[in-house]
Curated annotation (Swiss-Prot):
Gene3D superfamilies attached to this UniProt entry: Ribonuclease H-like superfamily/Ribonuclease H
One example GO MF annotation: protein homodimerization activity
Task performed by this protein: RNA-binding component of the PET complex, a multiprotein complex required for the processing of piRNAs during spermatogenesis. The piRNA metabolic process mediates the repression of transposable elements during meiosis by forming complexes composed of piRNAs and Piwi proteins and governs the methylation and subsequent repression of transposable elements, preventing their mobilization, which is essential for the germline integrity. The PET complex is required during the secondary piRNAs metabolic process for the piwil2 slicing-triggered loading of piwil4 piRNAs.
Protein name as catalogued: piRNA biogenesis protein EXD1
Subunit and interaction comment: Homodimer. Component of the PET complex.
Lineage: Eukaryota, Metazoa, Chordata, Craniata, Vertebrata
GO cellular component term, pick one: P granule
Domain (3'-5' exonuclease): residue spans on this chain: 112-304
Amino acid sequence: MNNRLNTTSSSEESRFLEEMKRKRVNITLSDTEISGVIQKITQKKTLILEDVSEVRSGRRFPGAKLIFGKEIVKVEFPLSAGQASVFSNEKHKSEFQTFKKKMTLDGEEDGVSYVLIDELHEKFGPAVMHIQEQDVIGIGADVYGQSGQERLCWLQVATKKVVYLFDILLLGGPAFKNGLSMILENTHILKVLHDCRCITRCLRTEFRVQLTNVFDTQVAELLLFFNESGGFLPDRPASLPELLQLHLRLTTAEIQPLCSKQQQSRECVQLWYVRPCPPDLLSLMCSSVQHLLSLRLLLLDALLADYTVLVDSFMSSSHCPPLHFQQDECAVPPELQELMCVRQQRMDWASQCYSQTDSGLLQRSSFKASPHTPADAQ
């Protein structure tokens, strides 16, 4: 058995198998396309199908048919009576059409293109080699399943000019054995993510991959909020669209696709299981990671703002030598002593601009602009 999949909990495996069992599936092999009902999925990603027929000729095969994962080129869930599908009812059809109409981001316009990688030939090796040459990369993931029981479907890796979309459902464990693990566990490559919890859990549980050297934009924003409010915490973490709008100044129209992605992922839980994946979804996956590298730099600058101000103050004070040089150098500089006053001023500002929950957290949605900003307190 694949050792990387043995770590999957028995409850998760049972749930996943039960959801996929008895569904009709179309499978494209290298030389033909067959249709059948899923009877079993093994831990080696081998399918056992029953009621099997060849799509083109309609010829039926007696008994069950064994399909090895490495033989599969494409997987589709067709619409048929009595069978569940991602778009098996009019509601989902309507939702998906609305979703497609809202797609406005074009990676080419922003100087970023994407590369789809769904097999371990041709593009996979060069992609891994290119990523390994980077010092900083953006990482994103799309999963299927409830929190704590997710299954990794897509892994996105962003460089400055290219986003690689790895189809983990098709690639499986061999993708990590052949290079992805070395990238994700490399302590010399900084990985920028937004909310690292889900992807860290999936990588560790499914593939025994330990993600290292991570910059989490969601964590960075929480710390920045804490600093700018004088010690308060928000009632919830910020979403990626919120950060892109606040720090990168993206317009509402520019972040709308990301908002749509979050909504559609909630309403259509099997969205990331669709094979072949619609081009609009591929573009959307690209857009969800292409800004992470720029966002990291802005958040770092914001987090270091107080530090920069203090260094400038120290340098300015050096132009006016104190009368008692030795004594002053041993004492705590006045600039540092002022930090407590600045902190109190920021707390007062935050108390005026936000409503508090019963737990003492600040409600993000209640923000009211104030004539005095945290920057005025510096």
